[in-house]
Structure formats: structure tokens, C-alpha cells
Amino acid sequence: DELGFKTYWVTYHDSVKRSGHLFAEMRGGKGKKIVMIGHLDTVFEVDHPFQKYIRKGNKAFGPGIADMKSGDVSMIYAMKALDHVGALKNMDITLAFIGDEEKLGAHSSIVRKELIEAGKWADIGFGFEGAGGMNSGTIARRSASSWILKTTGIQGHSSRVFSESLGYGAIFESSRILNAFREELAEEQYLTFNPGAIVGGTDIEYDPLNARGNAYGKTNVVSQSVVVHGGIRTISMDQLDNAMNSMKKIVSNNLPGTTASIEFKTSYPPMEPTQANYDLLDQLEDINKALGYGVLKPLDPSMRGAADISFVAPHVDAALAGMGPDGHGAHSEDEWLDLSTLPKTTSRAAILIYRLTR
């Protein structure tokens, strides 16, 4: 507010079970329209023992200090720098501080509506999580989707397993499918898929929201039911569509006496590696070199998970993530920030935004 931004909270009904978001808007009308993305939440619960800030030289330890309190600070101080030289008031900028980045939940169309609208308004998108140092930038991030595979078999005495009347059972069918996924798709670049939980037997229960289940079975009874819950990541929507079609085809080729089905749910779309993103990284590299920080190379997308920049990237002309300071040990009690990188990422972001808005 002190810088002249219009700030407001976006909140949701209790039934959504997700935190709200803080937005700040500057509408000066000059140059490219910019949206900058941070997040306020961490993975650490209120009662988690890791709750202290400790500084050791240029290392600062604390919950969420790298992921991503420091990125939020870098965003704010880049705005302060632009205000200091009298440039901020003329710019079109939206700052989005998301409240539930670490666990999106089941209502992405609801809780990312405002962020997507900001992306449609903007020309350029920036994500302020770190990229692992001052010499790498993020021009792409993979998607995050989930899948649930269900197989069924004919329950009966195991002495007749593989017979024409009884067939192979649900567990053999799920094993066939998972192995076929591996054989046909595992070598494709930027495509990863992982079965994270499996429950199978005569009688099963599975809770997909909490990834927990129970199973009952006997060694002399052919299994009747299996549920497999997994994830899939891709570099583009085309790759995701192709992978889903391949997986569906594998699932449909059932062993005798079995049935199978698979369902997919996309949580985060991919941030695809467009030429415009590479060009924007080149502009940032020019600044990096001019400030004495060295070369800036694109980070391998397979090294990154999903992030909120992916909701903005399809709608803007160009996007970069990894704009924030360098830290390590995210999501652990060893999480720390390299304090020396905080002023560096702040200054180069301010200069890039200044140039984009001339």
C-alpha cells in the first residue's frame, strides 16, 4: 500500500478448504503488463518443531526461507527499487502471493481463477521461486497430473488361476499394465509417471484424497480388486495427451477374466519451453553479465516440479520462473537460504522489469 499498490485478499468458502491469496495491483499504463508470482504457505505445520530463524554467516535457516519467503521478499524489494527511481507509478504490474501453492487441493478451477485472469491480462509472467543459483533460469516447468488405475478379477480358488473359467485375477492384470507402462513409455524425454500407492486383494478400501487404503486377501484366493494411484509429469500438453492415450490403450488390452479402467486428473498444466521464454532469458542473462553475476543458462525442466507459473504461462507472451534467491534443502529441516543472492536477484529483476516497461 505504501508503494501505491491496490491490495486485496481473495478468500474462498470453507467447503473449498484452501487458503486465500494476496494480490497487489499497480496500473500506471506504461509498457509491458507484468504479473509476478510468489506464495505465502510452506510445507511445515504450525506444530512442526522446525520454527526458528537462525543465521550463520551468509546462510539463513528457517521453515520456508528458500521455498519461498525469500522470493516474496525479492518481489517486494524489486518494487521498492523501482519506486525509488520514480518508475513504479507508471507501470502495469500485478503481484500474486498465493496461499496454497504447496497443496493445491481438488478445486484448482476455483482457487486459481484469479491467477489465471491475471495471466490473461498480462504480457509477461515471472515466478519467484529459486532456480538453484545465479547462473540458471527456468524457461519450462512440467505439468503435474494424477491417475487412478482400477482392475478387477474373478474371485475363486487359486488352484484354478490362469484357467479359462477364472482367468488371471486383478493383481496380475495391474502388474501387466504397470510393466507395460514402463516398457513403452519410460524412455521418453521429460515424461515421468509413478505409481505411488497400490491396494489389492479380495476386499479393498482406498481413500484417494489421503492416499491411504486397506486390503484383505488370501494366498489361496484369486484377487478380485486392485487400485493403483499414481502421478504423471510432462513438458507439454501434447506430450500429456499422447501419454494418456498410450496408457489407455495398454489398460484396454486385458488379460482373460479381468477388466481395467484408468482416470486422469490434471492439477498443474505445463509451462512449455517457448522461443519467447528463451528470448526473455537472454535479456535476463545480459543483465546478469552486466552486474557481474556471469552467464545464465536454462535449467533442465526435468529438474523442476510443477508451480503456479504454469497457470499463467499459456496466456502470456513469455514467462520465466526461478527468478528468486538461491536456497537449498526445501521441504526439510535443513532448509537454508544463501543471503548473498537476495540483493542480486532483486536488482536484476528490477532492471529487467524496468527495461520491459519502457
Report the location of each language-model feature:
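Short glycine-aspartate micro-motif
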Residues: 33-35, 60, 121-127, 146-148, ...
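Metal-dependent amide/peptide-bond hydrolase catalytic core
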Residues: 15, 130-133, 139, 146-358
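Short glycine-enriched loops at secondary-structure junctions
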Residues: 39-43, 49, 142-145, 198-201
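A structural signal for isolated positions on well-ordered beta-strands in alpha/beta enzyme cores
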Residues: 8, 35, 92-96, 194, ...
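Residue-level recognition of beta-strand->loop/alpha-helix junctions
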Residues: 9-11, 97, 266
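Acidic/histidine-rich catalytic neighborhood of metal-dependent amide-processing enzymes
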Residues: 68-144, 200-210, 357
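Short pre-catalytic strand/loop immediately N-terminal to key active-site residues, enriched for Gly-Thr
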Residues: 56-67, 295-299, 332-333
